[in-house]
Amino acid sequence: PFDYDKEVYTDMLWIAEGITSYYDDKTIHRMGMFSDEEYLGIIASQINRLENSPGKDIMSLAHSSMLAWVKAYLPTEESMNTTVSYYNKGMIAATMLDLEIRAKGKKCLDDVMTALYTDFYKKQGRGFTHEEFIGVCTEMAGKDMKPFFDNVIFSTKPLDYERIFSQYGLSLKDENAGKTVAWSGVVSSHGNGKTTISNIYSNSPAVDAGLSVHDEIIAINGWRVDGRLEDHDAKYGVNDSVEITYARDGKIYTAKLTYAKSTK
């Protein structure tokens, strides 16, 4: 049903890839190769990754799927701040969808996938639309699932983890709550004796200091940097200011960076 001589746009890659990612770990857990604690740790890690992605507030999951050709496979230094992964958020959405369907104790996401295969592929020889997918989820959940999709798939609203997970006696704990951790907003890499900025979080101290992606960080307060810049964050407190020496396009510059409280 697809013309592979040209791009095929869809807003459902989160289903093809995100749900697959969900079942990757779910299947191993079912086999007993992950303990309950290990499996919940994997979910928590994925949630942590998403919540630390500024792009989640800019791009919806459906939009991320649709723009895969021009965004996911053509990343820029702004991708971290403007896009969201349909693998990462898709996996979380699938987790929440399964839990929502299971709430009445009758059906689960397995039943949705089986029905899609039987009713659309086997009986009609075709795929399905988003509307049809929502319809099958509604049937299996025994309630209207459109609000779930409107909030989780088609918008950039914060995900309501508490409501979903509390139904199963689970809750999320912010391990940084109450802590004051200094943060520069830089994501850097270190190799061949050089520390280079890979990404910068939007609205961060690094942006205010005028630093840019690809800058080579040479020194902090006159001391040579050995390793990633963010590895030095723990040495400083919130509101501490440091002098950053860096190279850009062959020229040496200095900048004043004032650490902020980490939200990561």
Outline where the language-model segments fall.
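Zinc-dependent metallopeptidase catalytic helix centered on the HExxH motif
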Residues: 1-55
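Acidic/His metal-coordination segments adjacent to aromatic residues that form catalytic metal sites
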Residues: 2-6, 66-80
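Conserved PDZ fold ligand-binding element
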Residues: 206-228
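Terminal peptide-recognition signature
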Residues: 20, 105-107, 149, 186, ...
